[in-house]
Structures are given as structure tokens and as C-alpha cells.
UniProtKB/Swiss-Prot annotation:
Region (Disordered): 25-47
Presence of the UniProt keyword Amino-acid biosynthesis in the record: no
InterPro entries tied to this protein: Frog_antimicrobial_propeptide
GO BP: any one term: defense response
Maturation propeptide residues: 23-46, 66-70, 78-82, 91-96, 106-110, 120-124
Modified residue annotations for Isoleucine amide: 102, 116, 130
Name this polypeptide is given: Preprofallaxidin-7
Modified residues (Leucine amide): 62
Tissue: Expressed by the skin glands.
Modified residues (Phenylalanine amide): 74, 88
Species this chain originates from: Litoria fallax
Length: 132
């Protein structure tokens, strides 16, 4: 009888241990499956959220542009052009009043169509270069 009790408890213990191990594996598999489904759902949600943010960003930019057009119908840069048809700046001032750019080199070109210099004078009077 004692040996029967021992064998019965041994079988019962081993059976319960194996059952608990099987249940743990099932739970792990179910958790993995749920995590996989959850990841897919979260990816879909992320995609929708990103798309919504993108649409909202575009709409806000369009709203800003329409406000700018309301207050600046020609744009900030074109406001200058509205009052100053010629671009206003240091370089453009020279072009506005002096059609030929002013500078040491350009002054020579303005009054002397042929460049003046030691080498160019030789070419002017002597077509064949003369060297020393």
C-alpha cells in the first residue's frame, strides 16, 4: 500500500509538471500571436497617424500661404519690386546709373577699346611678339 501511494503520487506529480509545462508553452505561443497581431495593428495605426499628420501639415501650409497672400498679395520679395522696378542694391545702383560697370579695368575698356598694358601695346604695334 505504501508503495502504491508513492507510485500514485509520483505519477500525479509528473503528470502535473508536464501539464504545467504544456500550458506555459501554450501561453507563450498565444502571447507571441497576440504580440504579432498587436504589432500589425500598431503599424496600421502608425501609418494612419503619419498620414493624418502629413495631411494636417499640408493644410496648415496652405492656410499660411493664403494668409500671406491676403496681407502680401505679391509676396515679401515682390513687395520690393512693386515700389522699385529695378532691384535695389549696391550692384544694381551701378547698373542703373552706369550702363558700363565701373572699376579700374572697366574704365580702361570704356575709354580705350584696346586694352592698354605692356604686352597689349606690343601686340598693337608689333603683330609678332618681341621678347627680350
Amino acid at each position: 500500500m505504501a508503495s502504491l501511494k508513492k507510485s500514485f503520487f509520483l505519477v500525479l506529480f509528473l503528470g502535473l509538471v508536464s501539464l504545467s509545462m504544456c500550458e506555459e508553452k501554450k501561453r507563450e505561443n498565444e502571447d507571441d500571436a497576440e504580440d504579432g497581431n498587436h504589432e500589425e495593428e500598431s503599424e496600421e495605426k502608425r501609418g494612419l497617424v503619419d498620414f493624418a499628420k502629413h495631411v494636417i501639415g499640408i493644410a496648415s501650409k496652405l492656410g499660411k500661404r493664403s494668409e500671406e497672400k491676403r496681407y502680401h498679395p505679391f509676396g515679401k520679395r515682390s513687395e520690393e519690386k512693386r515700389y522699385f522696378p529695378i532691384p535695389f542694391g549696391k550692384r544694381s545702383e551701378e547698373k542703373r546709373y552706369f550702363p558700363i560697370p565701373i572699376g579700374k579695368r572697366s574704365e580702361e575698356k570704356r575709354y580705350f577699346p584696346i586694352p592698354i598694358g605692356k604686352r597689349s601695346e606690343e601686340k598693337r604695334y608689333f603683330p609678332i611678339p618681341i621678347g627680350k
